């Protein structure tokens, strides 16, 4: 059975760029009848927090992703240590003693000579006495993985045949001098131990994959299938980061965007499919073929998100908006009629709040065209108001004044709402009610 994973670090809020791999993995699991694992890569003890870990779960739930399995990298240190010991015993993990300053000076010398800035494996030439002397100075080793000087290739789910020339890479540091692990080794160990069959992640990990394939092989573990998708950028083509709060999933949720709109744009942009609002995950899973994702960066444009969200709102039945309308203070006995009256003018549910204030007042009316207003007052029908009240009333005003089109409707809109634009007044008038409408037509704030 297919088992995919999404492995964020709980060091900040997820942004829309994180949503893309999370969704692509979840959709691939649905498409293949597989399972989805949420693994928190929380080995960075200084920056990882439980608050961010909880926020990740909330954000995924908002997107509609319910993990089948859960794991924490920090709970698997013993397995990481055992793997490191095996690599040491096999001669594939070796100690290095250079300081960051020494490595930087060496890198600059290489660049000055026109050489690639690759680690020269000087630590492998140290004798036992030299290592002991360095440790006597107080130096503690960091540990590098000894890469085999060969090309690693794989059949990528997105890119097709892919390869990395490991001979052109520095041996990667797997363990810091303080004994903590960098991303590379724990990720491989956990993928192997937890039975991950497919690793779907951003194309910025392609070089990592070449390295990690060698680590899988050195540990005698099965190598998963890899897929590297294009990355989301801002509308200006800049990379996304956790610092872009307005594009964090938390920020988008609090701003009133629909998860279906966010899902659709995050996944369909940069794919072979046209970008449109897809309401459910199963339909979206059927549309997303990893092999048809573009190689070019995919731009996430908030203006496009607004358009998708508006289309969802315009078709949203009251039952889906009811709880949020209640949160806005709109009473249940009037909320459905209100929602049906205003939704066509909204791009997000919270935008309904100002229109409720227009309904309930007070509104400062703007009175123009005295003849139209006078006829409106004289012909204002008795309650109850219904769906046909507006048409019957405006027909009578037209008969009395000869006003039509904008000359008829704009004075009434300004008097009843104080605004030049807004929802269809046929829906708003019954909500405003006769008494309040009469007061506004007389020029009173109501």
From Swiss-Prot:
InterPro entries: aa-tRNA-synth_I_cd-bd, aa-tRNA-synth_I_codon-bd_sub2, aa-tRNA-synth_I_CS, aa_tRNA-synth_I_cd-bd_sf, Glu-tRNA-ligase_bac/mito, Glu/Gln-tRNA-synth, Glu/Gln-tRNA-synth_Ib_cat-dom, GluQ/Sye
One function term, GO molecular function aspect: ATP binding
GO biological process: glutamyl-tRNA aminoacylation
Enzyme Commission no: 6.1.1.17
Motif position, 'HIGH' region: 8-18
Gene Ontology CC: cytoplasm
Protein purpose: Catalyzes the attachment of glutamate to tRNA(Glu) in a two-step reaction: glutamate is first activated by ATP to form Glu-AMP and then transferred to the acceptor end of tRNA(Glu).
Protein name per its UniProtKB record: Glutamate--tRNA ligase 2
Species for this entry: Methylobacterium radiotolerans (strain ATCC 27329 / DSM 1819 / JCM 2831 / NBRC 15690 / NCIMB 10815 / 0-1)
């Amino acid at each position: 059975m297919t088992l995919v994973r999404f492995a964020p670090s709980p060091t900040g809020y997820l942004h829309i760029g994180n949503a893309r791999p999370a969704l692509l993995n979840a959709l691939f699991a649905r498409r293949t009848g597989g399972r989805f694992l949420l693994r928190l890569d929380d080995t960075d003890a200084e920056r990882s927090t439980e608050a961010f870990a909880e926020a990740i779960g909330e954000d995924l739930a908002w997107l509609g992703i319910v993990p089948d399995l859960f794991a924490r990298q920090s709970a698997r240190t013993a397995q990481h240590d055992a793997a490191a010991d095996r690599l040491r015993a096999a001669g594939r993990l070796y100690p290095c003693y250079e300081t960051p300053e020494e490595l930087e000076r060496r890198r600059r010398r290489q660049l000055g000579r026109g050489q690639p800035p690759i680690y020269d494996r000087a630590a492998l030439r140290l004798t036992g006495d030299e290592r002991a002397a360095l440790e006597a100075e107080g130096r503690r080793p960091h540990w590098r993985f000894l890469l085999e000087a060969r090309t690693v290739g794989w059949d990528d789910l997105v890119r097709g045949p892919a390869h990395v020339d490991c001979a052109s890479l520095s041996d990667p540091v797997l363990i810091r001098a303080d004994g903590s692990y960098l991303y590379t080794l724990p990720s491989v160990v956990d993928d192997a131990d937890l039975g991950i069959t497919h690793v779907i992640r951003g194309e910025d990990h392609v070089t990592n994959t070449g390295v990690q394939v060698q680590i899988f092989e050195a540990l005698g573990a099965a190598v998963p299938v890899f897929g590297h998708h294009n990355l989301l950028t801002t509308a200006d083509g800049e990379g996304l980061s956790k610092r872009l709060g307005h594009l964090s999933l938390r920020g988008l949720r609090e701003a009133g965007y629909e998860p279906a709109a966010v899902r659709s744009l995050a996944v369909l942009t940069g794919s072979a499919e046209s970008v449109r609002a897809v309401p459910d995950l199963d339909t979206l899973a059927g549309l997303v073929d990893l092999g048809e994702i573009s190689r070019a960066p995919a731009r996430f444009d908030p203006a496009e998100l607004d358009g998708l969200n508006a289309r969802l709102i315009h078709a949203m039945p009251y039952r889906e908006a009811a709880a949020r309308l209640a949160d806005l203070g709109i009473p249940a006995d009037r909320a459905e009629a209100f929602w049906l009256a205003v939704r066509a003018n909204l791009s997000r549910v919270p935008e309904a709040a100002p229109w409720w204030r227009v309904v309930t007042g007070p509104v400062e009316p703007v009175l123009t065209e005295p003849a139209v207003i006078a006829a409106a007052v004289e012909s204002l029908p008795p309650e109850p108001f219904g769906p046909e009240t507006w048409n019957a009333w405006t027909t009578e005003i037209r008969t009395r004044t000869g006003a039509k089109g904008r000359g008829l409707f704009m004075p009434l809109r300004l008097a009843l709402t104080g605004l030049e634009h807004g929802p269809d007044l046929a829906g708003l008038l019954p909500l405003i009610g006769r008494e309040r409408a009469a007061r506004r037509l007389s020029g009173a704030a109501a």
